[in-house]
């Protein structure tokens, strides 16, 4: 899922291109607005943390791009390309390492399960 910052910075095409270059196939894409209830459920594990409200506020601040990808070892390939959550720890060449400016505004979410 590409978060609001990606759209604001016009990086959607670049992110999709990087995923396709890894041999993955985009099989679904939808631009949506996440409501506060869905955001709360998505970030439930962080509910008691100090940054929770900022996470919910950011993800609901504009449209996101939900995507479904297909390919060999897809989840592992995507998570490796996405990079560490903290952009200061993300390696150059990863999406977060190259484009993220702030941990909470890390431009992309990648699932760890199908």
Describe these PLM feature segments.
Residues 1-114:
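Non-catalytic terminal and connector segments of soluble metabolic enzymes
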